[in-house]
Amino acid sequence: ITNGTAVLGLGNIGALAGKPVMEGKSMLFKVFADIDAFDIEVDATDTDRFVETVKAIAPTFGGINLEDIKAPECFEIENRLKEELDIPVMHDDQHGTAIISSAGLLNALEVAGKKIENVRIVVNGAGASATSCTKLYVALGARKENILMLDSKGVITSDRPNLTESKKFFATDRRDVHTLEEAIKGADVFLGLSKGNVLTQDMVCLLYTSPSPRDRT
């Protein structure tokens, strides 16, 4: 179920335009898990109205999968529905992306011979997917002090006013980094979950490199 306010790669395109994406996700549920899923598009950007709509139709279903709802509203919607419904509620942009991303990270670290508690991580993006992925990284052992998160204004620092709760969680006390280029220098991991074409070839060269030519290939 969606209101089409944050469709991947397209942004706020509205409920109707988001229908093909929901149909595709419903098909994946059936093909890979034999779960009968129905795509529902709700023309409601108001949080209260969206929550009440989902609650009203919930008796028909065994579970709710929230999809493509913009932050920070998506966090409140998920939390309220989990509290007020007696069926499973999942937000795919948060939990689905986080699980897949974390699996990839763990495999990459194993190949590179690195430990998650030691790597420096740069996260470009601070929406639902980015914050959920990074929280799961922390749960798996990554250290918050080794993480830099950026939004459209640059590195999220603890002295910045009017931060949302999700951004406060990952705000850094460092004052020596402001841009993506500065943040990425010497980092081990880059997670890109914002707009495309922001990571340049020069920035890739700033990432941590092993002294072994074999490891660099």
Predicted regions mapped to residue ranges:
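A short, aliphatic-rich alpha-helical micro-motif
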Residues: 58, 116, 183-184, 204-207
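Short glycine/serine/threonine-rich phosphate/pyrophosphate-binding segments
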Residues: 74, 97-102, 126-135, 197-200
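Conserved small/polar residues in nucleotide/adenosyl-binding loops
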Residues: 208-217
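A glycine-rich, Thr/Ser-enriched phosphate-binding loop motif common to dinucleotide/cofactor-binding enzymes
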Residues: 91-107
